[in-house]
């Protein structure tokens, strides 16, 4: 029996308040309006950005259904939708690509003005919500809200992918892999023979390591205080791994000594102000490029000496690895299907969706790289 045009009742993980566990609830998911798509989720990854909301470091309206790194199958579409149809395998896009705004028209940028990241409203693009629980409307997250058996997204925030794609793997291309990998190949534009440093060896950091390797870097120095992550980093391309706690001097000084004055490219993939500064300082003062990839804590500012940049450093930021999402994500999936890279090493745990809180416990303990929840 078709569910198109009808309210769907299903399970979702609702965050009612910060610093509390998720609650598995019965929710109602309204049908898609014009230019919207309703998706049956198949697999979703647990990303640090979701945890930033739980911890209170990233502020978004509550109660909310989080989740933004996922893959699923189109259940139904609203009026006017032309780029996907029911039955298509898709990845929701936490940064849309409307194709019409100034950013989308600029070939060098991807932070579409239809995004809900900079100043979150917790709605779809028309300003309304599609989730109800216990009679209350529930907010969306980044226009995706994938911690639900069904979700509704705008058409410009979903990408059709290869019908043969294994969704329990390519869900990582929805955020973690593309964000890290693209930060190296698209944003920093790592060059062959160069020296790189990657701060933070979670799923995104390891994907940045993979990007540096793919771009031909000669040295890739992985930096983390958790030595348990070093073997995986080396497996994926790191040439050296260092723990800041093993040194008496600041880690940027250690890196500068190791690299004749500083690395060519550095990546902060943690989201801490102190490591953002260390990452900037460890790149060469005359020709280094440092990229901020980790989401910073809310309402905290950095103050820096302008001389750090005047000498020739470049300091950049990146969302979604610089990929124009609706165009770039299907191409990455095609590359995965062509075996140009593997995602297996990033997925350390697979759990049923109902065990979402266990998945976040694994994240907090540092025992997981990526936990994938299956529906």
Swiss-Prot record:
The modification Phosphotyrosine is found at residue 35. Dimer of identical or non-identical chains of three types; alpha, beta and gamma. This is All-trans-retinol dehydrogenase [NAD(+)] ADH1B. Catalyzes the NAD-dependent oxidation of all-trans-retinol and its derivatives such as all-trans-4-hydroxyretinol and may participate in retinoid metabolism. In vitro can also catalyze the NADH-dependent reduction of all-trans-retinal and its derivatives such as all-trans-4-oxoretinal. Catalyzes in the oxidative direction with higher efficiency. Has the same affinity for all-trans-4-hydroxyretinol and all-trans-4-oxoretinal. Keywords: Acetylation, Cytoplasm, Lipid metabolism, Metal-binding, NAD, Oxidoreductase, Phosphoprotein, Zinc. One of its GO terms (molecular function) is alcohol dehydrogenase (NAD+) activity. Belongs to the zinc-containing alcohol dehydrogenase family. Zn(2+) 1 binds at residues 47, 68, 175. It is found in: Cytoplasm. There are 7 different ADH's isozymes in human: three belongs to class-I: alpha, beta, and gamma, one to class-II: pi, one to class-III: chi, one to class-IV: ADH7 and one to class-V: ADH6. The gene is ADH1B. CDD domains: alcohol_DH_class_I_II_IV. Its cofactor is Zn(2+). PROSITE patterns: ADH_ZINC (PS00059). PANTHER family: ALCOHOL DEHYDROGENASE, ALL-TRANS-RETINOL DEHYDROGENASE [NAD(+)] ADH1B. The modification N-acetylserine is found at residue 2. Its EC number is 1.1.1.105. The modification Phosphoserine is found at residue 23. The lineage of its organism: Eukaryota, Metazoa, Chordata, Craniata, Vertebrata. It comes from Homo sapiens (Human). InterPro entries: ADH-like_C, ADH-like_N, ADH_Zn_CS, GroES-like_sf, NAD(P)-bd_dom_sf, PKS_ER. GO terms for cellular component: ciliary basal body; cilium; cytosol; nucleoplasm; plasma membrane. It catalyses: all-trans-retinol + NAD(+) = all-trans-retinal + NADH + H(+); all-trans-4-hydroxyretinol + NAD(+) = all-trans-4-hydroxyretinal + NADH + H(+); all-trans-4-oxoretinol + NAD(+) = all-trans-4-oxoretinal + NADH + H(+). One of its GO terms (biological process) is retinol metabolic process. Binds 2 Zn(2+) ions per subunit. NAD(+) binds at residues 200-205, 224, 229, 293-295, 370.
């Amino acid at each position: 029996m078709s569910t198109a045009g009808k309210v769907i009742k299903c399970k979702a993980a609702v965050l009612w308040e910060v610093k509390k566990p998720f609650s598995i609830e019965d929710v109602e998911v309204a049908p898609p309006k014009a230019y919207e798509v309703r998706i049956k989720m198949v697999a979703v990854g647990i990303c640090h950005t979701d945890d930033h909301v739980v911890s209170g470091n990233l502020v978004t309206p509550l109660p909310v259904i989080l989740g933004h790194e996922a893959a699923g199958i189109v259940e139904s579409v609203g009026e006017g939708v032309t780029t996907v149809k029911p039955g298509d395998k898709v990845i929701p896009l936490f940064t849309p690509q409307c194709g019409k705004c100034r950013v989308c028209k600029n070939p060098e940028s991807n932070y579409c003005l239809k995004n809900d990241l900079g100043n979150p409203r917790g709605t779809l693009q028309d300003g309304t919500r599609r989730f109800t629980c216990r009679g209350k409307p529930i907010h969306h997250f980044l226009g995706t809200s994938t911690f639900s058996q069904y979700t509704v997204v705008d058409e410009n925030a979903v990408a059709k992918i290869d019908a043969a794609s294994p969704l329990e793997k390519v869900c990582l291309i929805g955020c973690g892999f593309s964000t890290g990998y693209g930060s190296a190949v698209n944003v920093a534009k790592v060059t062959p023979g160069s020296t790189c440093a990657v701060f933070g060896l979670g799923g995104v950091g390891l994907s940045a390591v993979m990007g540096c390797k793919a771009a031909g870097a000669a040295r890739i120095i992985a930096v983390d205080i958790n030595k348990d992550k070093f073997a995986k980093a080396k497996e994926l391309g790191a040439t050296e791994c260092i723990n800041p706690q093993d040194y008496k001097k600041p880690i940027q000084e250690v890196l500068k000594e190791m690299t004749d004055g500083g690395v060519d490219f550095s990546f902060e993939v943690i989201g801490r102000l102190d490591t953002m500064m260390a990452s900037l300082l460890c790149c060469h003062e005359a020709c280094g490029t440092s990229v901020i990839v980790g989401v910073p804590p809310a309402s905290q500012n950095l103050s820096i000496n302008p001389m750090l940049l005047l000498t020739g450093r470049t300091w950049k930021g990146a969302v979604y690895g610089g990929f124009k999402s609706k165009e770039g994500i299907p191409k990455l999936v095609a590359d995965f299907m062509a075996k140009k890279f593997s995602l297996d090493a990033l997925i350390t745990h697979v759990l049923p969706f109902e065990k979402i809180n266990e998945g976040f416990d694994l994240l907090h303990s540092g025992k997981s790289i990526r936990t994938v929840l299956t529906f």
